């Protein structure tokens, strides 16, 4: 058995040394030794799964480790630097050997060059600091979903965030075979200023080594760049899943309540600002996870599990009317980290929270007052648009009882959403798995939200709402999704949803809570309890099935006029959409499977035939089952 290296042992306290000796994993010891030689910390602390150790991490965060207490018990706040407020796509790169090509759409750098650069920035970055070593588990414990992970960081805020978001994994590491695979994350915030923020953000790097399942992160504190178990681990998991025949997706998991108290589990992928959280948190439904899901096949069925145990959510516009469950958790005693909000009199405030904000306080820019401007003359908002909350799912009243089931839950239906003002109907079911993956998931577009008033936004392509995190060639990623239904007896139906359809005067055609009716209809379709109308691109609801749901669930009279406007088949716009998406594949995705082009051809032929028969617009009342 390989002993702990002397350079590591001499920096450990007795409790940390005993804990590390219990794990006895040569690959882990080698990773820690390399990190210590590289970053040169003064001390090393290793943390177990115990509540005592988790509390110790929180105390470190509050004792000069990047967080400050708020008046409500358990609540803390954290500020990232003004130039460190979000994920950095430009500085996030894959480290690839010369014989590995992920395609031009993925940001990469030569592995040797990239390792030299990021390790140069990490060299000596923990001098005078304490290195923290934490162990986590992605997916439920004691499960085929479980992936062990180790995080090394000098930021107690990062470690504290992970203790909320992630399942503990130290005991898992103790039982690992010596040759077991695990994910590795090394982070240093680098040199910090008097506010504890990274000074050298221009040298921010987030480099992903797919060969060693390792992520290096330096000169940054924003959780999306530093908390390894979030999107950094998703990139590693997509690569691992591709090798092993399962899926890692940027999806929520929710329980939709059908007749006779039936629960059907849906998964959903939405680009940012397209209704993902509001769907997963619909009143009367249950949530398992809001962000990342793993998928496995067992005995002819598809199962999924939430990778995390918490939420790192955007807090802007969270209010008691639109988000009652989340809002209640955020204003109740319990462990919550608020990042980049406005703080005044020991309370957190954010834009869109449903009350009047103080005119003074502190935020990510320092002392703040209403009307304060930055160096460029722009008014500084009270809270950043990407301000966040970090909370355990167990704090939510609507957590599903199967959330920690090591088997996961069966996938009843799949939803793909986007932001589209003029083309897609509010909900449509694909004809089959192949068309669902290709025409719903692999054809997602989301209009930019900063469009000029009176104009439609510019459609931005975002494959499966996962494009930023795909770590394999996009064509292979599509093929993996297509192949995943192989051996599944009845693949779950796939639906597209669109909550942003507008009329000719740019008024939204659907209400905020109408999405509940769309999902309840989809739940009935999963069980074959309602018929549907056939369009060139899929199945849409009948009016007579929606009207009773609107009345029963929303106490709303649903008119035939509203139905016709919402579910009008916009043939010309659909033809334009699929022309546009196909061109993207031909220009930018050289390994696109031929079945993608064949499917686009079939869909376009059906649309052309429908236009010859009905014209550019098809009323749903002209369609048949």
Protein language model features and the residues they cover:
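Short, glycine-/Ser/Thr-/acidic-enriched flexible segments
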Residues: 51-52, 139-141, 239, 257-261, ...
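Conserved NTP phosphate-binding and transfer environment spanning the P-loop NTPase/kinase superfamily
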Residues: 13, 68-70, 81-82, 87, ...
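Short acidic, glycine/serine/threonine-rich loops at helix termini
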Residues: 56-59, 144-150, 279-282, 298-302, ...
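N-terminal accessory targeting/assembly segments
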Residues: 2-182
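Charged, amphipathic alpha-helical linker segments immediately N-terminal to NTP-binding catalytic cores
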Residues: 177-250
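Phosphate-binding P-loop
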Residues: 245-248, 254-263
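Catalytic or ion-translocation cores adjacent to nucleophile or general acid/base/metal-coordination motifs
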Residues: 259-345
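Extended, Lys/Arg-enriched charged tracts that mediate electrostatic binding to polyanionic substrates
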Residues: 115-145, 218-237, 241, 378-390
């Amino acid at each position: 058995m390989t002993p702990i290296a002397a350079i590591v042992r001499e920096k450990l306290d007795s409790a940390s040394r005993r804990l590390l000796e219990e794990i006895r994993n040569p690959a882990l010891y080698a990773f820690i030794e390399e990190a210590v030689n590289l970053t040169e910390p003064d001390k090393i602390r290793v943390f177990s799964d115990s509540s005592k150790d988790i509390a110790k991490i929180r105390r470190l965060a509050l004792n000069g480790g990047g967080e400050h207490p708020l008046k409500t018990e358990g609540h803390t706040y954290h500020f990232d630097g003004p130039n460190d407020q979000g994920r950095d796509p430009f500085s996030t790169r894959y480290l690839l050997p010369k014989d590995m090509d992920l395609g031009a759409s993925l940001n990469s750098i030569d592995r040797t060059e990239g390792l030299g650069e990021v390790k140069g920035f990490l060299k000596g970055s923990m001098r005078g600091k304490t290195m923290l070593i934490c162990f986590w588990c992605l997916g439920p414990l004691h499960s085929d979903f479980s992936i062990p992970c180790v995080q090394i960081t000098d930021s107690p805020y990062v470690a504290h965030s992970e203790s909320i978001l992630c399942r503990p994994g130290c005991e898992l590491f103790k039982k690992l075979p010596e040759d077991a695979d695990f994910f590795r994350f090394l982070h240093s915030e680098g040199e910090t200023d008097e506010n504890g923020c990274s000074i050298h953000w221009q040298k921010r790097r987030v480099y992903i080594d797919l060969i060693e399942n390792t992520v290096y992160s330096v000169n940054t504190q924003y959780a999306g760049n530093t908390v390894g178990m979030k999107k950094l681990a998703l990139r590693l998991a997509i690569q691992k899943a591709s090798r092993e025949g399962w899926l890692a997706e940027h999806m929520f998991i929710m329980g939709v309540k059908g007749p006779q108290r039936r629960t059907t589990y849906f998964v959903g992928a939405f680009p940012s600002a397209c209704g993902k959280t509001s769907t997963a948190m619909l009143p009367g439904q249950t949530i398992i996870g809001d962000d990342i899901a793993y998928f496995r096949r067992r005995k002819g069925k598809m199962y999924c599990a939430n990778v995390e145990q918490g939420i790192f959510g955007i807090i802007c516009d969270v209010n008691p009317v639109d988000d009652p469950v989340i809002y209640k958790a955020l204003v109740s005693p319990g462990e919550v980290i608020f990042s980049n909000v406005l703080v005044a009199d020991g309370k957190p405030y954010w834009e869109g929270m449903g009350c009047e904000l103080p005119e003074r306080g502190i935020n990510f820019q320092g002392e703040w007052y209403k009307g304060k401007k930055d160096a460029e003359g722009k008014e500084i908002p009270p809270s950043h648009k990407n301000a966040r909350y970090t909370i355990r799912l167990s704090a939510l009243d609507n957590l599903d009882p199967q959330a920690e089931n090591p088997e996961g839950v069966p996938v009843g239906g799949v939803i793909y959403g986007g932001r589209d003002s003029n083309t897609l109907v509010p909900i449509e079911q694909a004809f089959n798995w192949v068309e669902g993956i290709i025409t719903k998931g692999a054809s997602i577009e989301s209009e930019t939200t900063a469009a000029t008033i009176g104009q439609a936004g510019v459609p931005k392509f975002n494959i499966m709402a996962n494009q930023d995190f795909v770590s394999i060639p996009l064509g292979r990623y599509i093929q993996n999704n297509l192949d995943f239904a192989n051996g599944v007896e009845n693949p779950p139906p796939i639906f597209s949803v669109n909550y942003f359809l507008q009329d000719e005067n740019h008024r939204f055609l659907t209400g905020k809570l109408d999405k509940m009716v769309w999902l309840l209809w989809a739940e009935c379709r999963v069980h074959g309890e309602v018929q549907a109308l056939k369009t060139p691109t899929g199945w849409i609801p009948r009016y007579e099935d929606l009207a009773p749901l609107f009345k029963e669930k929303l106490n709303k009279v649903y008119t035939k006029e509203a139905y016709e406007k919402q579910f009008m088949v916009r043939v010309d716009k659909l033809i334009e959409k699929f022309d546009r998406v196909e061109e993207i594949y031909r220009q930018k995705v050289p390994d696109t499977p031929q079945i993608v082009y064949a499917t686009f051809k079939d869909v376009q032929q059906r649309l052309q035939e429908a236009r010859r028969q009905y014209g550019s617009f098809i009323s749903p009342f002209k369609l048949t089952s």
